[in-house]
Amino acid sequence: MNFHLHINRGAGAFVCGEGSALTASIEGNRGMPRVKPPRTVEQGLWGKPTVLNNVETYANVPKIILQGADWFHTIGTEGSPGTKTFSLTGSIENTGLIEVPMGTSLRHIIYDIGGGLKSGAAFKGVQIGGPSGGCLIDDQIDHPPVSYT
């Protein structure tokens, strides 16, 4: 399979992670979200239907093409197949980028993979989802598990 790929570097504004803001930025306009509908799959880049996904989604495509959708659905949970990447940072023993099956609890990620908190410090909370995410306290890191729902 051959295809042409063009990578266009954006201005780096957080808001440009939103699909319509990203297309506006690529078109040379201010990267601001637009009112929907239409969605970018109907009218996106230069007014044409546009598929936009994050790098995590695109990273799964070759594995699914090579091994099939049935294989992909064996990873994770029935309602949330596949994997999720996390960047472990802060006061944790083992920092770095990890990939876990959907359905993995944050407690498992923090303590079993991340090695727990440095110096045995008491857990106060964890921020998930980047700047637009939220914070969870100890009694919230088992449920809900990592999922799409």
Question: What is the meaning of each model-derived region?
Answer:
Residues 118-126, 130-146:
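Terminal amphipathic helices with adjacent charged low-complexity linkers/tails
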Residues 1-102, 114:
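Hydrophobic alpha-helical positions that pack around
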Residues 70, 112, 138-142:
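Acidic-enriched, low-complexity/disordered segments with a strong bias for Aspartate over Glutamate
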Residues 149:
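Conserved small/polar residues in nucleotide/adenosyl-binding loops
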Residues 103-118:
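Short amphipathic, charge-patterned alpha-helical segments
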